[in-house]
Design a protein with these regions (language model features):
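N-terminal alpha/beta PP-like core and its mobile active-site loop of ThDP/TPP-dependent enzymes
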Residues: 1-133
Length: 133
């Protein structure tokens, strides 16, 4: 079993029935695992649409939906929808991709070397109950 299979199974067992997402390389293993699951998948053309769809879903169903977005700009595109849900106390789970720790460039002082690095956790901490890498 892959870790991504475990994550998807865990979320499904905890009651996640629906996921809003846009495919991207930073979440490819989760995409493969969710494709095999019983979780309903709603593919959007923009990550912000996924976050707002999950916000609307949470308002209607009173339970969290899952949002999946890839690294860098994919993750930052969810921020407005996440903030909207946070302000209205709407449940939502957002999982974004991240570059490998070995590829993170903060260690060598370079801003970016092509991995679409963004410190999404720092951006999300003020508008979420929990944000972690």
């Amino acid at each position: 079993m892959k870790l991504s299979d475990y994550v998807v199974d865990f979320l499904h067992e905890k009651g996640i029935k629906d996921a809003f997402l846009l495919a991207g390389g930073g979440i490819m293993h989760l995409l493969d695992s969710i494709a095999k699951s019983d979780i309903n998948k709603y593919y959007n053309l923009h990550e912000q649409a996924s976050a707002f769809a999950a916000d609307g879903y949470g308002q209607f169903a009173n339970k969290p939906a899952l949002v999946l977005a890839t690294t860098g700009p994919g993750a930052t595109n969810t921020i407005t929808g996440v903030a909207s849900a946070y302000i209205d106390s709407i449940p939502m789970i957002v999982i974004t991709g991240q570059v490998k720790r070995a590829d993170i460039t903060k260690i060598n002082g370079v801003r970016q070397t092509g991995g679409q690095e963004i410190d999404i956790v720092s951006m999300a901490k003020g508008i979420t109950k929990y944000a972690k890498t």
